[in-house]
């Protein structure tokens, strides 16, 4: 959290109204999780207190709105991207689905409490496949048995299929569809193209132009639209015994084709294998096998996902442009840096486009 005793006391007071029966609250052990991304600031901490005359403690997670421009494009006008949209989506999914979501403590829109909007949720214990270094090169995934690796990926795809069964209207998530907009792939393509062009300004990005031209000529029909996670990948799941204990990071949630989520999942599989030249470990299913796993869990046929995999890589390349713009604005990189143009996301996109050139 931000430095300063006063803010810690304000968080204590805020928690005192939300941790039922807790008195004498103290906060300790603040730390940032390993592999934190570029969106909302995250802090893990422990709250100790008394309840019914007995000492107790609870591990919690604080997510603060970043002062920087949001990483993702705004799906719903009037809703902040980083914190607001994520808390609302998680609340709806906890109430209207069996998707594993962390228990929520509360959401605060009043920036006077900690200087920024924030929410607090309970900590969910488990392991997370990190991407620096890649989990396909070291860590628990490499140490796992081939059977457990396969079981883990299959379980993640089962959770994704379960998410896609959620009726967004019954769950109260219809606010994710702006008035007058037909949700689906065509709308998402428009949204992301506008987002990337705005971030590029007058700079040229030939690979983005090539990808957009290819995508525009091949917009598929959507099987249906549903709640899309927006950042579906193993690294956004907390795993326990190779099973999803908690899905995280819903900043990019939208109402779109379920194939958009699956394409993002498969693009990230490419990103941790072919993009860096890392061989698939024994037991790891191929992308075709993963598509079949998802189809079996979803109970529907899933066709060629090349469009959605390339669309995913295009979005990822656009996100890097946005993140690099933020980095330059903060004075952390020089204005003439070219990471926005040359990075692992563009390598991934280029490799995918080579297959269709």
Locate predicted features:
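Activation of the activation-loop gatekeeper triad in protein kinase-fold domains
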Residues: 248-253
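Active-site activation/catalytic loop segments of kinase-like enzymes and analogous catalytic loops
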Residues: 259-299, 312-331
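Juxta-kinase regulatory segment immediately upstream of eukaryotic protein kinase catalytic domains
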Residues: 1-27
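Conserved protein kinase catalytic-loop anchor
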Residues: 225-227, 245
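ATP-binding pocket architecture of kinase catalytic cores
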Residues: 31-208, 218, 224
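Catalytic-loop of the protein kinase fold
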Residues: 227-229, 234
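Helical subdomain adjoining the active site within ATP-dependent kinase catalytic cores
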Residues: 304, 318-357
């Amino acid at each position: 959290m931000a430095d300063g005793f006063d803010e810690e006391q304000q968080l204590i007071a805020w928690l005192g109204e939300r941790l039922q029966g807790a008195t004498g609250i103290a906060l300790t052990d603040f730390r940032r999780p390993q592999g934190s991304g570029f969106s909302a600031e995250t802090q893990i901490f422990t709250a100790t207190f008394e309840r019914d005359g007995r000492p107790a403690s609870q591990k919690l997670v604080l997510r603060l709105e970043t002062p920087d421009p949001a990483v993702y494009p705004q799906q719903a006008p009037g809703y902040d991207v980083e914190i607001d949209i994520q808390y609302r989506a998680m609340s709806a999914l906890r109430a209207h689905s069996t998707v594993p979501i962390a228990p929520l403590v509360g959401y605060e829109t009043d920036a006077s409490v900690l200087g920024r909007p924030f929410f607090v949720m309970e900590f969910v214990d488990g392991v997370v496949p990190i991407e620096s270094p890649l989990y396909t090169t070291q860590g628990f995934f490499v140490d796992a048995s081939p059977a457990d690796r396969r079981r883990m990926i299959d379980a993640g795809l089962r959770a994704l299929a379960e998410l896609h069964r959620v009726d967004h209207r019954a769950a109260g998530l219809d606010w994710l569809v702006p008035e007058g907009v037909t949700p689906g792939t065509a709308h998402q393509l428009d949204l992301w193209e506008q987002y990337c062009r705005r971030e590029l300004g007058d700079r040229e990005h030939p690979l983005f132009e090539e990808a957009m031209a290819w995508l525009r000529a091949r917009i598929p029909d959507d099987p249906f639209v549903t709640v899309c996670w927006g950042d579906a990948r193993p690294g956004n799941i907390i795993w326990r015994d190779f099973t999803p204990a908690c899905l995280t990071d819903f900043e990019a949630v939208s109402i779109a084709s379920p194939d958009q989520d699956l394409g993002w999942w498969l693009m990230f599989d490419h990103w941790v294998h072919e993009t860096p030249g890392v061989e698939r470990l024994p037991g790891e299913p191929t992308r075709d096998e993963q598509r079949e796993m998802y189809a079996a869990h979803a109970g529907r046929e899933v066709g060629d996902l090349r469009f959605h995999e390339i669309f995913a890589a295009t979005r990822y390349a656009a996100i890097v442009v946005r993140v690099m713009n933020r980095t330059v604005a903060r004075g952390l990189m020089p204005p003439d840096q070219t990471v926005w143009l040359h990075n692992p996301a563009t390598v991934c996109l280029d490799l995918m486009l080579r297959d269709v050139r």
